[in-house]
């Protein structure tokens, strides 16, 4: 049967023309493709159903397995927990017995210590009673000694009181004379100091105004120089970035041209697609395969050219964006640096004005200190500093050599500050010494009038009073007392 069918088919094809044979072959191929597609769809549907059944069975088996596994684990865990409970109960009983024994021993110790505490308290009370008796006897003896010493001191105090009264009256007269002379002397000194201060103040005002004008002119020149440097930097920046700007403009023009070319290519591709659709219609109506292959090759070439142009366009856009970003960052950095330079110049101007205001007359006359080195030694030091193996370091030292005067002046100010601090410390020590002298003088000499009017004065005695206190006071060494007026005159 198949051979006959083949013969019939061969006979049937033999009676057809070339175009009919091609059409027949195409229809046959389409029928075979449809049959194969139907078989593939049926197989896919069958496999999907089988997969769903397998998934359902897998879920059910997993559920059963988990149930069995949970039961096994529960039994195992129950046995372990029972063993742990027995062990813990035994441990708890053992710990409870141990703590009961400790509590019993602590109760015994507490009773013994309470007994010892009671014994110690009774002995302590006995000792306190003994000490009270001893203290009372000692107080009685001290009271007797105090009364006897008080009688002696009162008689001695009355004699000294009369002597001090007479001496105080004489010293009051002397102090009044000294105070009058000192007030007159200080009033003359105050007037003279005010006149000197006014004249010095006028001179300093005039000198400060002249110095301020000079510094202002100097700082105007510095600001002008900074502005010129800023303009030079800006011009240099514009010259250095001019080529990059031109390159950026060229890239932008190329970008525009590339966009135009892409648009034209898109239109050309659209035309080619239209022609391809027409060729496909012609092909379906019976044209040759050769024309279709040529059209496909032309389409692939055009697609490659379009892709190549797109890559070039993206690369050009990335390069242009990178150049623009770099130029923006450089311009921002240059602007910030110029603003910092201007702010630094303004800050220097303000600091110079403040320094000129705070400058003393001595600093204006002698702004620099004299070096302890000779001229030859200074030249040798400078030559050694300049003789360096590093050329950059040598150039930097040469560039910053004008700052030597500034550092000399700064070091002079630091030395002056140290000298002023040392002088302040010495003056504070001298002030403390004078205060001590004045306090001693007032303690030994000055007595207020109210104290002399009182009938009884408080007497401070040593802790242990003896019968020989009066004789020891007479034998004490008398210190030489110097008046405060004499000390002040010597210091002035």
Curated annotation (Swiss-Prot):
Oligomeric and partner information: Component of the nexin-dynein regulatory complex (N-DRC).
Entry's Gene Ontology cellular component terms: axonemal dynein complex; axoneme; motile cilium
PANTHER family registered for this protein in UniProt: DYNEIN REGULATORY COMPLEX SUBUNIT 2, NYD-SP28 PROTEIN
Keyword Coiled coil: yes
Family membership noted in the UniProt record: Belongs to the DRC2 family.
Protein name as annotated: Dynein regulatory complex subunit 2
Entry function: Component of the nexin-dynein regulatory complex (N-DRC), a key regulator of ciliary/flagellar motility which maintains the alignment and integrity of the distal axoneme and regulates microtubule sliding in motile axonemes. Plays a critical role in the assembly of N-DRC and also stabilizes the assembly of multiple inner dynein arms and radial spokes. Coassembles with DRC1 to form a central scaffold needed for assembly of the N-DRC and its attachment to the outer doublet microtubules.
Residue runs in coiled coils: 16-95, 256-318, 373-401
Pfam families: NYD-SP28
Superkingdom: Eukaryota
Keyword annotations: Cell projection, Cilium, Coiled coil, Cytoplasm, Cytoskeleton, Flagellum
Residues in the signal sequence: none
GO biological process: axonemal dynein complex assembly; cilium-dependent cell motility; regulation of cilium movement
Localization, UniProt: Cytoplasm, Cytoskeleton, Flagellum basal body; Cell projection, Cilium, Flagellum; Cytoplasm, Cytoskeleton, Flagellum axoneme
InterPro entries referenced in this protein's UniProt entry, alphabetically: DRC1/2_N, DRC1/DRC2
Traits of the deletion mutant: Morpholino knockdown of the protein causes strong ciliopathy phenotypes, including pronephric cysts, axis curvature, left-right asymmetry defects and hydrocephalus. Cilia length and number appear normal, but cilia are dyskinetic.
């Amino acid at each position: 049967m198949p051979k006959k069918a083949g013969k019939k088919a061969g006979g049937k094809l033999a009676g057809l023309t070339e175009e009919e044979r091609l059409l027949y072959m195409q229809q046959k191929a389409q029928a075979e493709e449809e049959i194969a597609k139907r078989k593939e769809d049926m197989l896919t549907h069958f496999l999907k159903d089988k997969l769903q059944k397998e998934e359902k069975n897998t879920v059910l088996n997993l559920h059963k397995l988990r149930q069995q596994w949970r039961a096994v684990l529960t039994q195992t865990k129950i046995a372990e927990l029972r063993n742990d409970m027995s062990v813990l109960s035994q441990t708890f009983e053992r710990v409870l017995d141990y703590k009961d024994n400790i509590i019993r021993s602590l109760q015994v110790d507490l009773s013994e210590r309470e007994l010892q505490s009671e014994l110690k308290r009774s002995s302590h009370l006995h000792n306190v009673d003994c000490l009270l008796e001893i203290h009372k006897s000692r107080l009685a003896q001290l009271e007797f000694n105090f009364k006897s010493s008080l009688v002696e001191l009162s008689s001695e105090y009355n004699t000294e009181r009369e002597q001090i009264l007479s001496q105080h009256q004489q010293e009051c007269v002397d102090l009044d004379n000294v105070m009058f002379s000192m007030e007159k002397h200080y009033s003359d000194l105050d007037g003279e100091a005010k006149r000197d201060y006014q004249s010095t103040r006028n001179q300093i005002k005039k000198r400060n105004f002249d110095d301020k004008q000079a510094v202002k002119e100097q700082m105007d020149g510095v600001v002008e120089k900074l502005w010129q440097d800023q303009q030079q930097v800006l011009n240099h920046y514009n010259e250095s970035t001019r080529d990059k700007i031109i390159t950026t403009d060229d890239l932008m023009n190329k970008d525009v041209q590339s966009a135009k070319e892409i648009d034209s290519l898109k239109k050309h591709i659209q035309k080619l697609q239209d022609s391809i659709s027409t060729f496909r219609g012609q092909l379906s109506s019976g044209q040759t395969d050769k024309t279709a292959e040529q059209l496909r090759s032309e389409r692939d070439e055009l697609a490659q050219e379009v892709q190549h142009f797109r890559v070039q366009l993206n690369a050009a856009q990335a390069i242009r964006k990178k150049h623009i970003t770099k130029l923006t960052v450089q311009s921002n950095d240059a602007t910030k640096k110029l603003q910092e330079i201007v702010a630094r110049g303004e800050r220097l101007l303000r600091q110079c004005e403040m320094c000129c205001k705070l400058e003393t007359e001595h600093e204006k006359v002698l702004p620099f200190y004299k070096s302890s080195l000779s001229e030859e030694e200074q030249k040798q030091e400078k030559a050694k500093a300049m003789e360096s193996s590093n050329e950059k370091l040598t150039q930097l030292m040469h560039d910053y050599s004008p700052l030597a005067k500034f550092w000399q002046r700064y070091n002079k100010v630091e030395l002056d500050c140290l000298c002023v601090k040392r002088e302040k410390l010495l003056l504070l020590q001298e002030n403390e010494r004078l205060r001590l002298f004045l306090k001693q003088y007032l303690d030994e000499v000055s007595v207020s009038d109210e104290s002399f009017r009182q009938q009884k004065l408080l007497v401070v005695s040593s802790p242990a009073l003896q019968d020989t206190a009066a004789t020891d006071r007479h034998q004490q060494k008398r210190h030489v007392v110097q008046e405060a007026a004499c000390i002040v005159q010597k210091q002035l």
